[in-house]
C-alpha cells in the first residue's frame, strides 16, 4: 500500500497524530485529536478504530494513541509533502507565510511521490519550511531543533536575570492572524529578540527585535507560538 492509496481522511489523521508529538511529550489521545481537528469525539473514535484495524496505530480503549512504524512512515511522508509545498508557495510563487498552510493542506493529497521528489530537488533540498519547521528527508529522518517555546524559556529565567536574548527558530502556523502580527513587528524565523519582563502583575512579556527601538508586548498565545534558542542572558549588574 502506498501513501496515495490511503484516503484523505486517513492521511490527515496520521499527520495530526504525528504533529501532536512533535513539540510535546504529552500522550496523544482521542480528546487531543478532537481538539486539534475540531471534529466530534464520536467521529474521532470511529476513525481511530479504522486506523487500528489497518495496522497504522495502536490504541487501547480510552488510552493513548501511538503510531505504528508503518503509520509513522506515512505520517512523516505527509508532513514532508506539506512543508515542501509551503516552501514552494513562499519561495517560488510569492505567497506570504500566513497564506500557505490551508493551500498546502489542499494540495498535499493530490500530488505523487515522484512530484514531491522533483519538488524537493527543485527547491534545493530545504531543511526547514517558511515557519522554521523541519522538513523530513526522503528517508523519513527529521532534523531535531534545539528550541523551546518562549513561554517555557521565559519561565525558566534565573532569578535576577534582567534580559534574555534568543533566536527565533520556529513559529507555529496555526493562526494566520498571529503570523501577520509577527511579520508586522519583525518577529520572523531567524530574528534575534531581547526579552524582558512585562509590567508588574501582567502575564505579558516584552521583546525587542534587534535593531528596533520599540518593545513589543506579547501575551501567552504569542509566546506559546514562538520557539526559540538561547543566545545569552544578562543580569542587572551586567546590563
Give the role of each language-model region.
Residues 13, 33, 44-54, 190:
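Basic amphipathic alpha-helical segments that dock to polyanions
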Residues 52-62:
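A short, conserved structural fragment
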Residues 109-222:
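Mid-protein regulatory/catalytic core that forms ligand/cofactor-binding pockets
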Residues 42, 98:
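Key DNA-contact positions within bacterial/archaeal DNA-binding proteins
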Residues 30, 48, 86:
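Helix-turn-helix DNA-binding elements, focusing on the entry/boundary residues of the two helices
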Residues 1-38:
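Extreme N-terminal segment that seeds HTH/winged-HTH DNA-binding domains in transcriptional regulators
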Residues 63-82:
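Basic, amphipathic "hinge/linker" alpha-helix immediately C-terminal to the N-terminal HTH DNA-binding motif
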Amino acid at each position: 500500500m502506498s501513501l496515495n492509496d490511503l484516503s484523505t481522511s486517513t492521511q490527515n489523521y496520521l499527520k495530526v497524530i504525528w504533529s501532536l508529538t512533535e513539540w510535546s511529550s504529552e500522550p496523544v489521545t482521542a480528546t487531543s485529536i478532537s481538539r486539534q481537528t475540531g471534529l466530534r469525539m464520536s467521529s474521532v473514535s470511529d476513525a481511530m478504530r479504522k486506523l487500528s484495524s489497518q495496522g497504522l496505530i495502536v490504541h487501547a480503549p480510552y488510552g493513548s494513541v501511538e503510531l505504528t512504524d508503518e503509520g509513522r512512515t506515512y505520517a512523516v511522508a505527509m508532513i514532508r509533502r506539506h512543508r515542501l509545498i509551503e516552501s514552494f508557495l513562499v519561495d517560488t510563487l510569492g505567497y506570504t507565510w500566513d497564506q500557505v498552510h490551508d493551500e498546502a493542506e489542499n494540495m498535499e493529497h493530490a500530488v505523487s511521490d515522484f512530484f514531491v521528489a522533483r519538488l524537493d530537488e527543485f527547491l534545493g533540498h530545504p531543511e526547514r519550511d517558511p515557519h522554521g519547521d523541519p522538513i523530513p528527508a526522503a528517508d523519513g529522518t527529521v532534523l531535531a531543533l534545539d528550541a523551546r517555546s518562549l513561554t517555557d524559556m521565559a519561565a525558566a529565567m534565573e532569578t535576577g536575570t534582567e534580559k534574555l536574548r534568543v533566536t527565533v527558530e520556529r513559529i507555529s502556523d496555526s493562526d494566520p492572524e498571529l503570523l501577520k502580527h509577527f511579520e508586522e513587528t519583525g518577529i520572523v524565523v531567524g530574528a534575534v529578540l531581547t526579552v524582558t519582563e512585562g509590567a508588574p502583575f501582567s502575564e505579558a512579556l516584552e521583546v525587542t527585535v534587534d535593531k528596533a527601538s520599540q518593545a513589543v508586548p506579547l501575551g501567552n498565545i504569542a509566546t506559546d507560538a514562538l520557539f526559540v534558542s538561547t543566545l545569552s542572558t544578562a543580569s542587572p549588574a551586567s546590563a
